[in-house]
């Protein structure tokens, strides 16, 4: 097996970033800066390419857990931890955006946040995004954790947390590990039950987002609310 060609210094991602700015670098090159070095037979840029291919691009990588990163051949604990920290900062950036922006006016931002939070989970999790009267994020909380195929959600717990956080509205999201981003009959029935429970305390259920890997679907957009 031939070794990868070494990069000329002028072509190093760090040198190009300093000269031309981070926006001029490709996704693998930006990852290379976080990784710092490659592994045997693979430079840092090639390792960045490999990670993006393995996890399905940036969106898939954003939903990757530290444990999943550690099993990548040659990546190692140190690189996995650095990369996990960078990805967590990216997730928190999405959360900051939700704190500052109207969630109803930014459905794509909501879907990206939910995918980042749930896309890598191996069992079903359900989260609730509690929103204020201006539909800005107050807090995101896990409301259920289950098995590969189901998570038991209790409407009373969601109602109690809505009251505790003085929420005016909320968005639910849960994942389908290994499945498709489509609402099941059980999903639809539970969502309507939760919506009715929240209506009793004058809290609006805006949406229920289903996540399956890098894919998301809005139950509101599909007419299920």
Curated annotation (Swiss-Prot):
NCBIfam families: PRK00024.1, radc
Source organism of this protein record: Bordetella bronchiseptica (strain ATCC BAA-588 / NCTC 13252 / RB50) (Alcaligenes bronchisepticus)
This protein's name: UPF0758 protein BB3258
Keywords: Hydrolase, Metal-binding, Metalloprotease, Protease, Zinc
One MF term in the entry's GO annotations: metal ion binding
Residues involved in Zn(2+) binding: 174, 176, 187
Motif segment (JAMM motif): 174-187
UniProt keyword Acyltransferase present: no
Highest taxon of source: Bacteria
Domain MPN residue range list: 103-225
Any Gene Ontology biological process: proteolysis
